């Protein structure tokens, strides 16, 4: 719980948080700073991205020609079908509490009815899916983020239309956009 970490810093129980992600923790970070007792200790050189994509080997094996362009997914839905997707291409998102309807809205807007978003119970479920897909030689399309340990094995993020403020349905847009690139700070 990030907010608990910020409160612990403010109370002197924790000295530093080395990982404040703009997209998921930015608002609570600035709220904590406004209360006092916590500072912006600088920005890492690494940029952050929280997005769906494929393990590098899916691209290397050309399982869906044209990746990472999202338009390739329109023609490859069957390649990403799983037993629980009803014959549709499946995107394995993190737990629904992470992003709500953000990815289902985007999939509906850009990929249509041939795709379905399934929610994993945890990050570990996503990594287990990567491992089983690699062992079985099947394509998988999952949520991921960078920087992350998966960077070492290679992970290719889908290239959606660029993010702009207001593009998501919950912000009044049509959800025909990808995720923003963000900063990574220390508190």
Q: What are the roles of these predicted feature ranges?
A:
Residues 5, 66-69, 73, 99-103, ...:
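Stable alpha-helical elements in mature extracytoplasmic
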Residues 59, 65-68, 83, 108-109, ...:
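A residue-level marker of the well-folded mature domains of exported/periplasmic proteins
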Residues 37-92:
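A conserved helix-loop-strand patch within extracytoplasmic ligand-binding domains
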Residues 10-14, 75-78, 100, 108-112, ...:
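Sec-exported extracytoplasmic/periplasmic mature domains
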Residues 13-15, 86-89, 111-115, 137-140:
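Loop/turn elements at helix/coil->beta-strand transitions in domains of secreted/extracellular proteins
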Residues 1-17:
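Extracytoplasmic small-molecule ligand-binding "clamshell" domains
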Residues 3-4, 22-42, 109-111, 118-187:
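Flexible, solvent-exposed loop/hinge segments that line or gate ligand/substrate-binding clefts
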Residues 15-19, 50-53, 90-94, 141-144:
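Structural recognition of the beta-strand scaffold that forms the well-ordered cores
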């Amino acid at each position: 719980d990030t907010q608990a970490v910020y409160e612990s810093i403010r109370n002197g129980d924790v000295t530093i948080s080395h990982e404040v992600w703009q997209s998921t923790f930015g608002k609570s970070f600035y709220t904590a700073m406004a209360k006092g007792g916590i500072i912006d200790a600088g920005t890492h050189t690494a940029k952050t991205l929280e997005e769906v994509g494929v393990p590098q080997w899916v691209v290397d094996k050309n399982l869906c020609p044209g990746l990472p362009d999202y338009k390739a997914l329109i023609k490859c839905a069957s390649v990403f079908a799983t037993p629980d997707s009803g014959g549709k291409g499946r995107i394995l998102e993190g737990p629904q509490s992470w992003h709500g309807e953000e990815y289902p809205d985007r999939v509906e807007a850009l990929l249509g009815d041939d795709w379905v978003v399934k929610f994993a119970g945890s990050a570990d479920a996503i990594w287990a899916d990567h491992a089983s897909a690699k062992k079985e030689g099947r394509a998988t399309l999952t949520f991921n983020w960078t920087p992350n340990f998966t960077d070492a094995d290679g992970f290719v993020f889908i290239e959606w239309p660029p993010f702009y403020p207001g593009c998501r349905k919950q912000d009044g847009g049509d959800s025909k956009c990808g995720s923003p690139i963000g900063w990574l700070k220390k508190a």
